[in-house]
A protein has these predicted regions:
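Hydrophobic, small-residue-rich alpha-helical packing segments that form membrane-like cores
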Residues: 1-5
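Short amphipathic alpha-helices and their capping/turn segments at secondary-structure boundaries
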Residues: 20-28
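Active-site-adjacent beta->alpha loops and helix N-cap segments on the catalytic face
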Residues: 17
């Protein structure tokens, strides 16, 4: 009943907006249910590339209509989360969160308003924010049951094995998907070794709350 809302990510780890946008444009799809988002962005990328301004430059460079591009980073996403009565557009009764930019050439932010209050001017912060103080219960929560050492990453092979067959994840550049890859890895002193020549490295997930 609700249909499907497409969110095209252009972040640091996942970058698929240009590929998806090309498909949308080539097939003349209705963009009302399409948004441009960033997902996670590293601080270095924020500093060097920008945020949604960078995505807008990319989209317009691909030939996307200007109005549709603006809608994709504002009202479309607000509608997807049923927040369009508060944000996503300029209208009486809505939150006056506004960025004034230089225009479609580079979208450099000149002035920012939050809740109708001007908080930046030409990149300078006009308001003062106190450093947040946190309750003790939310501090020092990353407690590992067992300390992590180099030995934590050792994978022991069956006794007497010189090589083992292993199932590994084949990661794709800037895509949140993996492919299956079957490899044969060497064993040294009973421990399965990484193999740089095959681009096989260890990866581990450590639960921090147990």
């Amino acid at each position: 009943r609700n249909g499907c809302h497409l969110m095209m990510r252009e972040g640091s780890a996942a970058r698929n907006m240009p590929v998806l946008l090309k498909t949308v444009m080539e097939n003349h799809l209705d963009t009302a249910m399409v948004s441009i988002v960033t997902d996670d962005l590293h601080t270095v990328d924020l500093q060097e590339r920008g945020h949604l301004d960078d995505s807008l430059r990319t989209a317009l460079g691909m030939g996307l209509d200007f109005v549709k591009a603006i809608q994709m980073v504002t009202v479309n996403c607000a509608r997807a989360f049923n927040l369009d009565r508060e944000i996503g557009g300029l209208a009486p009764g809505r939150r006056a969160d506004i960025n004034i930019t230089t225009g479609p050439q580079d979208f450099r932010v000149l002035t920012t308003f939050a809740g109708g209050r001007q908080i930046t001017d030409n990149g300078k912060l006009l308001v003062h924010y106190e450093t947040a103080e946190h309750e003790p219960c939310v501090l020092n929560t990353m407690n590992l049951k067992n300390p992590i050492t180099a030995d934590s990453f050792k994978i022991h092979a069956p006794a007497g094995a010189k090589k083992v067959k292993a199932l590994v994840m084949d990661t794709l550049p800037y895509m949140p998907f993996t492919n299956r890859r079957d490899v044969e890895l060497p064993v040294v002193d009973g421990v399965v070794q990484c193999d740089v020549e095959q681009d096989v490295l260890y990866i581990a997930l450590s639960l921090i709350h147990i």
